């Protein structure tokens, strides 16, 4: 068996990636989120496949087909809610994974980091299109508002929006193409994830100390496989508690009302995992400025490696940078809360201040703290 594992052309790749892979001996539970994201992706593809067998991407029947899945299909309700809440778990793991990369300086692996940013954008696009498919009020108006933002692009904006819509408003053509893209994108994400791993295994994993661990490696199996299984069990428990006890906790009640172009909901808002970006978009009174800020709120991750001024890699031994990192986390939570609130005083002001702080912390304060810490250590 050992010979096949090490000599078979296909099994050999799996062996070098998940069994005999040399891994640092000191990586913490924060390194579990990569495998959890893989599990989430597989879960989403499988549940999505079964949903696609019963879903119809037509404006007249989309809402009814989702109701039919929940009421008439065997265990359709659990498949639907695992898919909806699985997306929330996916984003929790995704944000934790990105946060860990920022905290421990994993962004110095530039290829892995950049592929990761591309993955983040792709997952966000997939989730947005998936939210449109049930064709409830929030699906329809969310699609209308977010796609309409592209009209802020000079010269080509209006034509671009109508091209994406497939007409003069969000309608049957829009729903059909969103379903097609929502179906194909997870497979593209899988391919990108494989490239992400390929680049990671070129350099090897980072570790909490931030220094090279070449002198102290251990095999991935059994040490980290068992550790990953514990993480998967925790993820499964959390997901099933959510699905079985409060499946609609993270959803919007308005999405149980069929889409009606003649009636606008009082508060249009996306799913909770996009609220921070939505709050940044709303905090800028100018449409084009808001769209640019929205894109930059994610693209800022690509700038972070260029602004790394510290001579240490991670923040493990940098208390000043740690304070700023947790300030950024608190700011993100504030933005998430603001994104779900109506556009009125005092939420507008809080949102604007939180948006300024969101860009100020990684672009200005963190590089300065890196320089100060170098000076304090006489480097």
Curated annotation (Swiss-Prot):
Binding site for a ubiquinone: 201
Matching SUPFAM superfamilies: a domain/subunit of cytochrome bc1 complex (Ubiquinol-cytochrome c reductase), Transmembrane di-heme cytochromes
Keyword Phosphoprotein assigned: no
Pfam family, one: Cytochrom_B_C
Positions bound to heme b b562: 83, 182
Record's subcellular location: Mitochondrion inner membrane
Gene3D superfamilies recorded: Cytochrome Bc1 Complex, Chain C
Residues annotated for heme b b566 binding in this entry: 97, 196
Bilayer-spanning residue ranges: 33-53, 77-98, 113-133, 178-198, 226-246, 288-308, 320-340, 347-367
Cofactor note: Binds 2 heme b groups non-covalently.
Primary localization: mitochondrion
Topology relative to the membrane: Multi-pass membrane protein
Entry annotated with the keyword Iron: yes
Molecular function via GO: metal ion binding; ubiquinol-cytochrome-c reductase activity
InterPro entries: Cyt_b/b6_C, Cyt_b/b6_C_sf, Cyt_b/b6_N, Cytb/b6-like_sf, Cytochrome_b, Cytochrome_b_C_euk/bac, Cytochrome_b_N_euk/bac, Di-haem_cyt_TM
Key words, A-Z: Electron transport, Heme, Iron, Membrane, Metal-binding, Mitochondrion, Mitochondrion inner membrane, Respiratory chain, Transmembrane, Transmembrane helix, Transport, Ubiquinone
One of the GO biological process terms: mitochondrial electron transport, ubiquinol to cytochrome c
GO cellular component, one term: mitochondrial inner membrane
Cofactor entry: heme b
Misc: Heme 1 (or BL or b562) is low-potential and absorbs at about 562 nm, and heme 2 (or BH or b566) is high-potential and absorbs at about 566 nm.
PANTHER family, sorted: CYTOCHROME B
The protein's assembly and partners: The cytochrome bc1 complex contains 11 subunits: 3 respiratory subunits (MT-CYB, CYC1 and UQCRFS1), 2 core proteins (UQCRC1 and UQCRC2) and 6 low-molecular weight proteins (UQCRH/QCR6, UQCRB/QCR7, UQCRQ/QCR8, UQCR10/QCR9, UQCR11/QCR10 and a cleavage product of UQCRFS1). This cytochrome bc1 complex then forms a dimer.
Function per UniProt: Component of the ubiquinol-cytochrome c reductase complex (complex III or cytochrome b-c1 complex) that is part of the mitochondrial respiratory chain. The b-c1 complex mediates electron transfer from ubiquinol to cytochrome c. Contributes to the generation of a proton gradient across the mitochondrial membrane that is then used for ATP synthesis.
Family label: Belongs to the cytochrome b family.
Protein name: Cytochrome b
Gene name tied to this protein: MT-CYB
């Amino acid at each position: 068996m050992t010979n096949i594992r090490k000599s078979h052309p296909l099994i050999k790749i799996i062996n070098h990636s998940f069994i005999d892979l040399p891994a640092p001996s000191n990586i913490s539970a924060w390194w579990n989120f990569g495998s959890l994201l893989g599990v989430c992706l597989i879960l989403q593809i499988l549940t999505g496949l079964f949903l696609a067998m019963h879903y119809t991407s037509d404006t007249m029947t989309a809402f009814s087909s989702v109701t039919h899945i929940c009421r008439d299909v065997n265990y359709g309700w659990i498949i639907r809610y695992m898919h909806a809440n699985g997306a929330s778990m996916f984003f929790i793991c995704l944000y934790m994974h990105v946060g860990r990369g920022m905290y421990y300086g994993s962004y110095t692996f530039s290829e892995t980091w950049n592929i990761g940013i591309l993955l983040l954008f792709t997952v966000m696009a997939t989730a947005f299109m998936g939210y449109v498919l049930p064709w409830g009020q929030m699906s329809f108006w969310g699609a209308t508002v977010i796609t309409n933002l592209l009209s802020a692009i000079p010269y080509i904006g209006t034509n671009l929006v109508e091209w994406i819509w497939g007409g003069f408003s969000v309608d049957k053509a829009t729903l059909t193409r969103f379903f097609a893209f929502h179906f194909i994108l997870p497979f593209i994400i899988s391919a990108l994830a494989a490239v992400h791993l390929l680049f990671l295994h070129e350099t090897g994993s980072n570790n909490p100390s931030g220094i090279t661990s070449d002198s102290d490696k251990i095999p991935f199996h059994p040490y980290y496989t068992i550790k990953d299984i514990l993480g998967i069990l925790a993820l499964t428990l959390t997901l099933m508690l959510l699905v079985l006890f409060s499946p609609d906790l993270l959803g919007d009640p308005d999405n149980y009302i069929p889409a009606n172009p003649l009636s606008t909901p009082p508060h249009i808002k996306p799913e909770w995992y996009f609220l921070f970006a939505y709050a940044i978009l709303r905090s800028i009174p100018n449409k084009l400025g808001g769209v640019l800020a929205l894109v930059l709120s994610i693209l800022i991750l690509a700038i972070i490696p260029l602004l790394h001024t510290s001579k240490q890699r991670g923040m493990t031994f940098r208390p000043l940078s740690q304070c700023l990192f947790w300030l950024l986390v608190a700011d993100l939570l504030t933005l998430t809360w603001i994104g779900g609130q109506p556009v009125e005083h005092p939420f507008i002001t809080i949102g604007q201040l939180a948006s300024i702080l969101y860009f100020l912390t990684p672009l200005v304060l963190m590089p300065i703290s890196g320089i100060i810490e170098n000076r304090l250590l006489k480097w």
